[in-house]
Amino acid sequence: MVLAVEVIVCCLIFGIYRVIRIKRDPAYKISNMPEKLQKKVMHMRGYRNRNIRIMTDWEKFVKKLPTLIFWTIALVILTSIAGAKSFSTGFVFALLIWMAVLLFLELVVYCGWYAHTPKVWIKGTEDMAKKTYTNYAHYIGLIPQRALMGIVVAIIAVSYTHLRAHETSLH
Protein backbone atom coordinates (compact mmCIF):
# COMPACT_ATOMS: atom_id res chain seq x y z
CA MET A 1 0.00 0.00 0.00
CA VAL A 2 2.83 2.40 0.87
CA LEU A 3 4.46 1.73 -2.49
CA ALA A 4 1.24 2.57 -4.35
CA VAL A 5 0.96 5.87 -2.49
CA GLU A 6 4.61 6.64 -3.25
CA VAL A 7 4.06 5.96 -6.95
CA ILE A 8 0.97 8.19 -7.11
CA VAL A 9 2.62 11.01 -5.18
CA CYS A 10 5.79 10.85 -7.30
CA CYS A 11 3.78 10.89 -10.54
CA LEU A 12 1.79 13.90 -9.37
CA ILE A 13 4.81 15.82 -8.09
CA PHE A 14 6.93 15.26 -11.18
CA GLY A 15 3.98 15.75 -13.54
CA ILE A 16 3.06 19.08 -11.96
CA TYR A 17 6.71 20.13 -11.89
CA ARG A 18 7.14 19.43 -15.62
CA VAL A 19 3.91 21.22 -16.55
CA ILE A 20 4.95 24.30 -14.56
CA ARG A 21 8.45 24.30 -16.10
CA ILE A 22 7.10 23.96 -19.64
CA LYS A 23 4.50 26.69 -19.10
CA ARG A 24 7.14 29.00 -17.65
CA ASP A 25 9.71 28.30 -20.39
CA PRO A 26 8.58 26.51 -23.57
CA ALA A 27 12.22 25.86 -24.53
CA TYR A 28 12.86 24.05 -21.22
CA LYS A 29 12.98 20.57 -22.83
CA ILE A 30 14.42 21.66 -26.18
CA SER A 31 17.42 19.31 -25.94
CA ASN A 32 15.02 16.34 -25.84
CA MET A 33 13.04 17.46 -28.88
CA PRO A 34 13.73 16.33 -32.46
CA GLU A 35 16.86 17.84 -34.02
CA LYS A 36 14.85 19.58 -36.74
CA LEU A 37 13.01 21.65 -34.11
CA GLN A 38 16.23 22.40 -32.23
CA LYS A 39 17.84 23.77 -35.40
CA LYS A 40 14.87 26.03 -36.11
CA VAL A 41 14.77 27.39 -32.55
CA MET A 42 18.55 28.05 -32.52
CA HIS A 43 18.07 30.55 -35.35
CA MET A 44 14.93 32.24 -34.05
CA ARG A 45 15.27 35.82 -32.87
CA GLY A 46 14.07 35.35 -29.29
CA TYR A 47 16.31 32.34 -28.64
CA ARG A 48 19.66 33.30 -30.20
CA ASN A 49 21.05 34.70 -26.95
CA ARG A 50 20.04 31.63 -24.90
CA ASN A 51 22.91 29.44 -26.09
CA ILE A 52 20.56 26.79 -27.46
CA ARG A 53 22.51 24.23 -29.43
CA ILE A 54 22.26 20.61 -30.40
CA MET A 55 23.83 18.57 -27.61
CA THR A 56 25.75 15.36 -27.97
CA ASP A 57 24.54 12.33 -26.04
CA TRP A 58 27.33 12.88 -23.51
CA GLU A 59 26.28 16.51 -22.95
CA LYS A 60 22.67 15.42 -22.46
CA PHE A 61 23.84 12.85 -19.90
CA VAL A 62 25.91 15.43 -18.01
CA LYS A 63 22.94 17.80 -18.03
CA LYS A 64 20.76 15.04 -16.51
CA LEU A 65 23.33 14.03 -13.88
CA PRO A 66 21.93 16.22 -11.05
CA THR A 67 18.48 14.75 -11.70
CA LEU A 68 19.88 11.21 -11.65
CA ILE A 69 21.65 11.92 -8.35
CA PHE A 70 18.42 13.33 -6.92
CA TRP A 71 16.52 10.23 -8.08
CA THR A 72 19.13 7.93 -6.54
CA ILE A 73 18.76 9.64 -3.16
CA ALA A 74 14.95 9.72 -3.46
CA LEU A 75 14.81 6.01 -4.31
CA VAL A 76 17.02 5.14 -1.34
CA ILE A 77 14.49 6.88 0.90
CA LEU A 78 11.36 5.64 -0.89
CA THR A 79 12.39 1.98 -0.98
CA SER A 80 13.23 2.10 2.71
CA ILE A 81 9.86 3.65 3.55
CA ALA A 82 8.09 1.09 1.35
CA GLY A 83 9.63 -1.66 3.45
CA ALA A 84 12.06 -3.32 1.05
CA LYS A 85 13.96 -5.94 3.05
CA SER A 86 16.15 -7.51 0.38
CA PHE A 87 18.15 -6.32 -2.60
CA SER A 88 15.73 -7.87 -5.09
CA THR A 89 12.64 -6.40 -3.41
CA GLY A 90 14.29 -2.99 -3.19
CA PHE A 91 15.34 -3.16 -6.83
CA VAL A 92 11.80 -4.05 -7.92
CA PHE A 93 10.33 -1.24 -5.79
CA ALA A 94 12.83 1.33 -7.08
CA LEU A 95 12.39 0.30 -10.70
CA LEU A 96 8.61 0.26 -10.34
CA ILE A 97 8.61 3.83 -9.02
CA TRP A 98 10.99 4.98 -11.77
CA MET A 99 9.01 3.31 -14.56
CA ALA A 100 5.66 4.55 -13.25
CA VAL A 101 6.90 8.14 -13.21
CA LEU A 102 8.60 7.71 -16.60
CA LEU A 103 5.48 6.31 -18.24
CA PHE A 104 3.28 8.93 -16.59
CA LEU A 105 5.49 11.74 -17.88
CA GLU A 106 5.89 10.36 -21.40
CA LEU A 107 2.33 9.14 -21.97
CA VAL A 108 0.20 11.51 -19.89
CA VAL A 109 2.19 14.74 -19.63
CA TYR A 110 3.94 14.74 -23.02
CA CYS A 111 1.69 12.67 -25.33
CA GLY A 112 -1.52 13.64 -23.57
CA TRP A 113 -1.10 17.25 -22.47
CA TYR A 114 1.95 18.78 -24.18
CA ALA A 115 1.27 17.36 -27.64
CA HIS A 116 -2.24 18.84 -27.57
CA THR A 117 -1.59 22.24 -26.00
CA PRO A 118 -0.28 24.55 -28.75
CA LYS A 119 -0.20 27.57 -26.44
CA VAL A 120 2.83 26.07 -24.61
CA TRP A 121 4.76 25.26 -27.78
CA ILE A 122 7.67 27.47 -28.79
CA LYS A 123 6.20 30.43 -30.68
CA GLY A 124 7.04 30.28 -34.36
CA THR A 125 7.39 26.49 -34.52
CA GLU A 126 3.73 25.53 -34.76
CA ASP A 127 4.19 24.64 -38.44
CA MET A 128 6.40 21.73 -37.35
CA ALA A 129 3.79 20.22 -35.01
CA LYS A 130 3.26 16.93 -36.86
CA LYS A 131 6.98 16.17 -36.92
CA THR A 132 7.75 17.44 -33.44
CA TYR A 133 5.13 18.17 -30.81
CA THR A 134 2.47 15.66 -31.85
CA ASN A 135 4.96 12.99 -32.89
CA TYR A 136 4.12 10.29 -30.33
CA ALA A 137 6.85 8.01 -31.69
CA HIS A 138 9.42 10.56 -30.54
CA TYR A 139 8.16 10.56 -26.94
CA ILE A 140 7.69 6.79 -26.81
CA GLY A 141 11.10 6.28 -28.42
CA LEU A 142 12.74 7.92 -25.39
CA ILE A 143 11.29 5.33 -22.99
CA PRO A 144 13.86 2.50 -23.54
CA GLN A 145 16.87 4.80 -23.00
CA ARG A 146 15.33 6.29 -19.87
CA ALA A 147 14.31 2.83 -18.63
CA LEU A 148 17.98 1.77 -18.85
CA MET A 149 18.93 4.84 -16.83
CA GLY A 150 16.29 3.77 -14.31
CA ILE A 151 17.81 0.31 -14.01
CA VAL A 152 21.23 1.82 -13.24
CA VAL A 153 19.79 4.32 -10.76
CA ALA A 154 17.74 1.58 -9.05
CA ILE A 155 20.79 -0.68 -8.73
CA ILE A 156 22.87 2.13 -7.21
CA ALA A 157 20.09 3.20 -4.84
CA VAL A 158 19.31 -0.30 -3.64
CA SER A 159 22.99 -1.27 -3.40
CA TYR A 160 23.52 1.61 -1.02
CA THR A 161 20.45 0.68 1.03
CA HIS A 162 21.47 -2.98 1.09
CA LEU A 163 25.01 -2.13 2.20
CA ARG A 164 23.69 0.12 4.96
CA ALA A 165 21.40 -2.67 6.16
CA HIS A 166 24.34 -5.09 6.37
CA GLU A 167 26.47 -2.50 8.10
CA THR A 168 23.89 -1.82 10.80
CA SER A 169 23.08 -5.51 11.31
CA LEU A 170 26.74 -6.37 11.85
CA HIS A 171 27.15 -3.92 14.73
Where are these regions (language model features)?
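Alpha-helical transmembrane spans of integral membrane proteins, capturing the lipid-embedded, hydrophobic core
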Residues: 7, 11, 15, 64, ...
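Long, highly hydrophobic alpha-helical transmembrane signal-anchor segments
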Residues: 1-7, 61-91
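Short membrane-interface loop/juxtamembrane segments of multi-pass integral membrane proteins
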Residues: 40-55, 125-140
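Juxtamembrane non-transmembrane "cap" segments at the membrane-aqueous interface
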Residues: 110-128
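Loop-to-transmembrane boundary segments
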Residues: 52-65, 134-151
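Conserved small/polar residues in nucleotide/adenosyl-binding loops
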Residues: 161-168
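Hydrophobic alpha-helical membrane-embedded segments
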Residues: 8-28, 97-113
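Membrane-interface helix-loop junction between the first two transmembrane segments
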Residues: 20-44
